[in-house]
């Protein structure tokens, strides 16, 4: 059922020691995640969410219910994997399940400097395919595990997951931990479903989000990122980086409608706020981040 949430499906599959790599938010519906791509905590190991789709059921604009896979309505099957909901309403999705019950994961927090941010992102790029995560830099909000004296200071929040053994995870994570400035390190063995239960500040009623792609992230890009953070007046704002590559890049660029196979980093600018009348101001900031950092 395409209306289920990522968290619901992940918890159900965990009872069978199986997993599907969805995005990074358990509250989001699996339909949107799947049709748009699906970058989360397993994509470098098992591919994007859409790479694990075996078949879909689609209601077309004419009201017809159509089954599509590699052999039946193959053009439609190609288009919905990466083309979003532009080709009909996807009501059911058949996935390949991956044998996975636990990961080594959790949140790391580090004091942010341009050099440290650049080194951390590069270490994630160089890491084994089993390691995925979200690397976000933002002014630290009041939340658990953040010392009060760091509220408002720029921190790197890295929510990471390693799909492998604890010993292998320790080796893979060593370069990330080695960049220094670690404030908190909550990475530990856990059930895969637990990675979606990470805490955070309460949501706000309005949000501006823009995404972009990069192939390199050096000290200059990191410095630009840190400067841009100072330019936002939103109560909550961040720039996030998700490393691609691995299994994502091993699928041919024309095999699905997802066209960013060869990109190395996906960036996201986020501004969350309460006053909807301020949307143009915060949209301008997320646009500025996008145009300042995007490559190609």
PLM features: residue spans?
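Soluble FAD-dependent oxygen oxidases
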Residues: 1-296
